[in-house]
Amino acid sequence: MGTHMYSEQGINNTINISTTSLTNATQLTVIGNNNSVYIGNNCKIVSSNIRLKGNNITLFIADDVENMGLVCSLHSDCSLQIQAKTTMGNGEITIAEKGKISIGKDCMLAHGYEIRNTDMHPIYSLENGERINHGKDVIIGNHVWLGRNVTILKGVCIPNNVVVGSHTVLYKSFKEPNCVIAGSPAKIVKENIVWGRKMYHSTMYDDPTLNEFYK
């Protein structure tokens, strides 16, 4: 399980961290009631700072997830789901306003990513006084690769098998899978692609992990 620090203030909190997972140099803080933390089998959560502050918060990390240096803040009635075999460099995730961020299976997030479902400060209309920048959920599909220093803002949905180029800021959703998104403003720059993790394969047919994309 490794060395980690865990602190809790509140009641009816459930913390379930698999004994097969490594959580070295990680700080997990839970402040509030009725919160749930699940970290599955064979995960590596290293040098991370995860903070749940509020009530009815859910953190779910599936099996075989690797995370090196996550700074994560979740507020009341929010949830973060990271599905199996996703790997993440150092980065920041912020969830508030009863929102959700979901990251699919077998994703790869390079260092410097920032994902948030909220602006964290209100903006009001001078015409009627109403707030105009409410939080919105963020959904990242399966097998998505975020390059270095990518920013994902509130309300963004990314389909399966997408590459997002380094330093791209995504503020709107895309519907087309199997593509590369890059630039400022972000746009599709390449279509009909699939990406892999290993450099030594000559073609996609040599990589058994990609079978589902062409069969």
UniProtKB/Swiss-Prot annotation:
Bilayer-crossing regions: none
Keywords, in A-Z order: Transferase
Known outcome of mutating H121A: Reduces activity 50-fold
Any GO BP annotation: protein homotrimerization
GO MF annotations, alphabetized: polysialic-acid O-acetyltransferase activity
Record's miscellaneous remark: Polymeric sialic acid-containing capsule provides a means for the bacteria to evade the immune response during infection by mimicking host sialic acid-containing cell surface structures. O-acetylation of the sialic acid residues of capsular polysaccharides alters their immunogenicity and susceptibility to glycosidases.
Assembly and binders: Homotrimer.
Family note: Belongs to the transferase hexapeptide repeat family.
Listed name of the protein: Polysialic acid O-acetyltransferase
Organism: Neisseria meningitidis
